[in-house]
Amino acid sequence: MGYPGKNHKQYATPKRRFEKTRLEDEKRLIIDYGLRNKRELWKAQSVLRKYRAGARELVALRSGGLSTEDYLKKRDQLVNHLYRYGLVGENADVGDVLALKVEQQLDRRLQTLVLRRGFARSPKQARQFITHGHIAIKGRRVTIPGYRVERAEEAEISYYGPSPLTNEVHPERSRIARAGVR
């Protein structure tokens, strides 16, 4: 166990530290998604690893003699959870969970959605807007760029009420509009 008040790592580091192809892929993802460091990427990979492990466990339980009713219940719990976060479609199966990619997980981060919805010009600017408190979900300020946005919350992303960016004539808003992002 351990001391419950002490935080523990939420990710696992790669086993081969200097594998060239992995390093190149990580660098590309960090640049594309505007991640601060590799730790953020490793966290996303660890979350996906847990989902895949749950799906593999379901497959093993199914072949091990679990009743159809229990299997369907557990499968629906897993798929509904992933559907709520927008990682799989509504009619997904265990195979879809096993086929998840880290890019799908990174696409659900608040930082990425702020950029894609046109609130910022670049991933770095999206991160800055979030950490400085200019972005809100359902009217509540969110200052965590790695916040996983649920499917229902996606339409509720906006500028935070007291933020100067809510004003349409703000210079940065006009730059964003001129850039053709929004």
UniProtKB/Swiss-Prot annotation:
PROSITE patterns: RIBOSOMAL_S4, S4. InterPro entries: Ribosomal_uS4, Ribosomal_uS4_arc, Ribosomal_uS4_CS, Ribosomal_uS4_euk/arc, Ribosomal_uS4_N, S4_RNA-bd, S4_RNA-bd_sf. Residues 108-172 form the S4 RNA-binding domain. It comes from the Archaea. The keyword Ribonucleoprotein applies. Transmembrane segments: none annotated. GO terms for cellular component: small ribosomal subunit. Belongs to the universal ribosomal protein uS4 family. PANTHER family: 30S 40S RIBOSOMAL PROTEIN, 40S RIBOSOMAL PROTEIN S9. One of the primary rRNA binding proteins, it binds directly to 16S rRNA where it nucleates assembly of the body of the 30S subunit. With S5 and S12 plays an important role in translational accuracy. This is Small ribosomal subunit protein uS4. It comes from Methanoculleus marisnigri (strain ATCC 35101 / DSM 1498 / JR1). The gene is rps4.
